[in-house]
Structures are given as C-alpha cells and as structure tokens.
C-alpha cells in the first residue's frame, strides 16, 4: 500500500468516526428534548403515570409555590400533589404550560442539561393569568433512557 492510499484510508476512517459521533450527539439531544416533552405533555390526572415514568429516583425539584422544594424517590408525585393542593386553595384552574424552543441542550456522557422558556397560562379566581418562566432540567441516561434527575421553574 502506498503512502497516498494509506493517508486516504485514514482520512476516510476519521471522517466516518467524526460524522457518526456527531450524529449520535444529535440523537442524544433529540432524546433529551423528547424526555422533557414526555414529562410535561403527560402532567394530567389521566396520564400522570407516563409523566412520572420519566422521573429518576431520587429527583430534586424547585418551584415557585410552597414548600418550594421536593426531593427523594417520590418527589415528582409529591410535587404534583402539592401543586394540585396549592391550585385548589388559590382557585387556580385551567393550567397549561408550553415550552418554547430550548435555549440550551448540553449532553456530556450520561448527563444532560436542558433550559427552555416556558409560558404558563391559567385562571385565578376566574381571571386569565399568563406567566413567562424558565424551565431548567438535569437528566441522567439510564438503561431505560433519559430520566429527569432535577428540575427548576422560575418566573421571569
């Protein structure tokens, strides 16, 4: 084998490796976004188990309403129960959260970090309210796929 042929072969191998790792990285980002969407899209009494299946154990949560933080193996379910109690006490109904285009999706090995704008629309005492917020999520890749390890919601 001559030097040119060897150099060409090495170049092709390197390019193939770079392209396949870039593709895998893009797939990881897509999977991370899908996991976050699967969690939020299933926050409802009829589909809650699907949302909870995206939560890792343990999970840490920070949110705007008391007690403001939840952690442990049942944190996602505990947060959902606290949210419903808070909403009932404060006459909040018809809540709907929508994510915008992610500002940041970073994947490093089996860990990921996701940040996106969120719009939360609801009625309080019958009046429409619209909140702009940031939604930040830390995820961990498991054998079952990407799972939420922590998340935080903050009004802007």
Over which residues does each language-model region extend?
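Bacterial N-terminal signal peptides that target proteins for export
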Residues: 1-11
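Short, low-complexity N-terminal intrinsically disordered segments enriched in polar/charged residues
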Residues: 11-13, 17-54
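Second-shell loop/turn segments in exported
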Residues: 26, 38-41, 62-69, 125
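Hydrophobic pocket/interface hotspot
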Residues: 39, 50-52, 59, 72, ...
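A mature extracytoplasmic/lumenal domain signature
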Residues: 55, 65-66, 116-120, 152
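A short gly/proline-enriched turn/hairpin at secondary-structure junctions
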Residues: 60-71, 88-91, 107
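Surface-exposed, charged secondary-structure patches
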Residues: 77-125
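Short beta-strand edge/turn micro-motifs at domain boundaries
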Residues: 130-156
């Amino acid at each position: 084998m001559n030097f040119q042929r060897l150099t060409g072969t090495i170049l092709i191998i390197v390019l193939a490796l770079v392209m396949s790792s870039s593709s895998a990285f893009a797939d990881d980002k897509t999977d991370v976004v899908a996991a976050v969407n699967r969690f939020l899209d299933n926050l409802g009494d009829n589909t809650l188990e699907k949302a909870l299946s995206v939560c890792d154990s343990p999970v840490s949560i920070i949110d705007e309403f008391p007690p403001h933080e939840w952690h442990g193996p049942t944190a996602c379910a505990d947060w959902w129960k606290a949210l419903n109690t808070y909403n009932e006490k404060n006459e909040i109904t018809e809540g709907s959260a929508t994510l915008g285009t992610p500002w940041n999706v970073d994947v490093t090995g089996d860990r990921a970090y996701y940040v996106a704008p969120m719009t939360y629309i609801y009625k309080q005492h019958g009046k429409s309210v619209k909140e702009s917020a940031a939604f930040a999520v830390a995820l961990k890749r498991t054998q079952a796929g990407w799972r939420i390890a922590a998340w935080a919601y903050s009004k802007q």
